[in-house]
């Protein structure tokens, strides 16, 4: 009887939800490919840097974070303290969420003084890093959800159980949770993944400009804060302080804000080396207009 109650699932997945899942998965797979092709066409690219970026994500985003998490929990008394004090648990989750981004910044800081590094090197590294994250993590989860949803609509719980290789008497209540999520949220999750990737790529260009122009290191602090802000909603959701449905919209808004700030900064100080990638006619127009006004002033004096 308990098994039957555990497998009770009400309704089916709406077609709109299925479509949004598929579109989201396609977006997450296509994004790094499109960005990679665009960068290859605009800059001298090296496939080796793509591979380095991919390995960096595996080492930092997956292996190191998991090892760090296990190491923290193995410290005597830590698990008990985290169970007793929510603040400590929240702090640990926040740190684990932010560690990959700070590690990524550290890699760039380590290589920033190498003169051989050009914008293509930075971009290809980030494309490799982003591709692994989006394709192997985000897109895999989204397409897996889509397969489960299509299988359930076609063959019911028995089909899902057969696909997963488990008993049909198990607990499939998670299907109710998946159906309760509006289809647009799945689509927004894919869009948010692409926005986050754009933010990171913007950081790469930003980092290149900071290094090339020898600007103040306070920009690194701004970057670290923005990275942290992007990861805060997920960390709050992990510890139960933010509803799951609110995470993607909030992260998307934060990413849009970060992108807006990056674009403003880039438009103010685009160096000649970045011109082929981010050339804007209006910027050239303003430069010519400014040069004309300066020549007039010099002639007047």
Task: Report the location of each language-model feature.
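Hydrophobic alpha-helical segments at protein termini of multi-pass membrane proteins
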Residues: 2-301
């Amino acid at each position: 009887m308990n098994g039957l109650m555990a497998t009770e699932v009400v309704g089916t997945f709406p077609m709109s939800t299925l479509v949004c899942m598929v579109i989201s998965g396609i977006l997450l797979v296509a994004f790094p490919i499109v960005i990679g092709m665009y960068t290859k066409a605009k800059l001298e690219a090296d496939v080796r840097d793509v591979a380095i970026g991919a390995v960096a994500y595996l080492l930092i985003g997956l292996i190191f974070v998991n090892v760090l998490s296990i190491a923290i929990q193995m410290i005597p008394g830590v698990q008990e303290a985290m169970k007793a004090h929510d603040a400590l648990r929240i702090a640990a989750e926040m740190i684990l969420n932010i560690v990959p981004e700070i590690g990524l910044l550290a890699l760039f800081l380590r290589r920033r003084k190498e003169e051989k590094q050009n914008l293509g090197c930075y971009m290809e590294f980030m494309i490799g890093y982003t591709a692994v994250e989006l394709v192997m993590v985000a897109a895999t989860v989204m397409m897996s959800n889509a397969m489960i949803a299509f299988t359930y609509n076609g063959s019911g719980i028995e089909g899902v159980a057969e696909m997963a290789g488990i008993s049909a008497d198990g607990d499939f209540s998670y299907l109710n949770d998946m159906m309760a999520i509006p289809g647009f949220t799945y689509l927004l999750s894919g869009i948010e993944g692409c926005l986050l990737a754009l933010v990171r790529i913007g950081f790469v260009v930003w980092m290149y400009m900071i290094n090339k122009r020898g600007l103040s290191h306070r920009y690194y602090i701004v970057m670290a804060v923005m990275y942290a802000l992007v990861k805060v909603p997920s960390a709050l959701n992990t510890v139960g302080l933010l509803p799951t449905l609110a995470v993607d919209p909030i992260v998307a808004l934060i990413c849009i804000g970060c992108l807006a700030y990056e674009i403003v900064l880039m438009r103010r100080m685009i160096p000649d080396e970045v011109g082929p990638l981010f050339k804007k006619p209006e910027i050239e127009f303003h430069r010519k207009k400014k040069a004309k006004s300066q020549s007039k002033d010099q002639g007047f004096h």
